[in-house]
């Protein structure tokens, strides 16, 4: 009258000692399988670090050479500008007729306005009148 249960699936029941041994065997096999991939991962991780380190050193050397080239080109492009600024400062200090040297498109600089204000305010009054007229024109549109 014994019917096979789902746990036995028609197999004969075995002694508890045999079943415990199989469980222990399975338990021992699982950690060995799990440890093997971890060890291989550790090996690959340590081998990746020196490669990255070497890559950055090479990259750093390239950047340094590029930086030197960039700095040289920047110095060449900055030097003419600095020379012009230095000359402009010398001219504004030495001459009061700089406004006459300017073309029709160029207006007096802020430094020139400051110099004019120290000499007299008549020039500023004229400038203010012109700016007021231009603002009124824009308001009529």
Swiss-Prot record:
Coiled-coil annotated spans: none
Chain residue ranges for the region called Disordered: 1-47, 66-141
Residue stretches of biased makeup (Acidic residues): 84-103
InterPro entries recorded: SPAN-X_fam (IPR010007)
Comp. bias regions, Polar residues: 1-10, 66-80, 132-141
Pfam families tied to this protein: SPAN-X
Chain intervals with Basic and acidic residues compositional bias: 11-26
Domain of life of the source: Eukaryota
Family: Belongs to the SPAN-X family.
The name this protein goes by in its record: Sperm protein associated with the nucleus on the X chromosome N3
Organism: Homo sapiens
Lineage: Eukaryota, Metazoa, Chordata, Craniata, Vertebrata
